[in-house]
A protein has these predicted regions:
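N-terminal secretory/targeting leader peptides
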Residues: 1, 16-216
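Extracytoplasmic "Venus flytrap"/periplasmic binding protein-like
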Residues: 1-9
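Short glycine-centered helix-capping/turn motifs at secondary-structure transition points
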Residues: 9-10, 88
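Divalent-metal coordination cores built from histidine and acidic residues
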Residues: 13
Length: 216
């Protein structure tokens, strides 16, 4: 969790990474459990082989997962998700259920895979030059306030996640749950696919070092 990152040294590691880019990392404004994103699909999935032949769309950040699942990929911008699902251009798409509800995905989607993956991705950076001009006591206050916000948001998110999932069911979306072994495989495809994408985009030592620090 975001709070754990502040306790085990990962937060400081990320701060130093951001500084190299001229930024100061304050924290995660959407601190969540590791099932922030879900997959919307219009074909029932019951076994791993059912992903083969599907066309899954979304940002390039999800392509590693799609490839690990055995599906073909389509790059889409977020405003295209709803219309692409409605017109059958794609068979499925990854996004948070909050964003999915906002863009109307429940209206054009038959199924939602109930096993979520990844955490909320937004971060809160500050220009490093600006940060360095802020008095130290105010810097400390901002860091402490952000840490407290992450704890409160985490609890808030857990409740909102349950409510939003219920709203999807009430809208007629069937929630699919896999057997334990298939669930494990599905989550591994998401996690390892994400690292595949990161390594491809940022070759070198940074990603392996980050993976070693933040994975359990």
């Amino acid at each position: 969790t975001a709070s754990e990152e502040r306790e085990n040294g990962i937060y400081e590691y990320i701060v130093e990474m951001y500084k190299k880019a001229g930024l100061y990392y304050l924290g995660r404004p959407e601190a969540s459990k590791p099932h922030y994103f879900h997959m919307y699909v219009n074909k029932r999935i019951e076994k791993p082989e059912d992903f083969a032949g599907l066309k899954l769309g979304g940002s390039t950040a999800f392509h590693g997962q799609y490839k690990r699942l055995g599906a073909s990929v389509a790059t889409l911008t977020i405003p295209e998700y709803q219309s692409a699902m409605e017109r059958g251009v794609i068979d499925g798409v990854d996004t948070s259920i909050f964003m999915g509800a906002t863009m109307g995905l429940p209206e054009v989607t038959r199924y939602l895979i109930g096993h979520g993956f990844y955490r909320g991705t937004p971060s809160l950076p500050v220009n490093l030059d600006t940060w360095n001009r802020i008095p130290k006591d105010l810097q400390n206050m901002m860091v402490e306030t952000m840490a407290e916000f992450e704890k409160k948001y985490y609890a808030y998110w857990v409740e909102q996640d349950k409510l939003c999932l219920k709203e999807h069911e009430e809208a007629g979306v069937e929630i699919l749950y896999f057997p334990p072994d298939m669930e494990k495989w599905f989550i591994e495809c998401a996690n390892e696919g994400s690292w595949d994408y990161a390594m491809e985009r940022f070759p070198g030592d940074v990603i392996p070092q980050l993976k070693e620090r933040i994975t359990k």
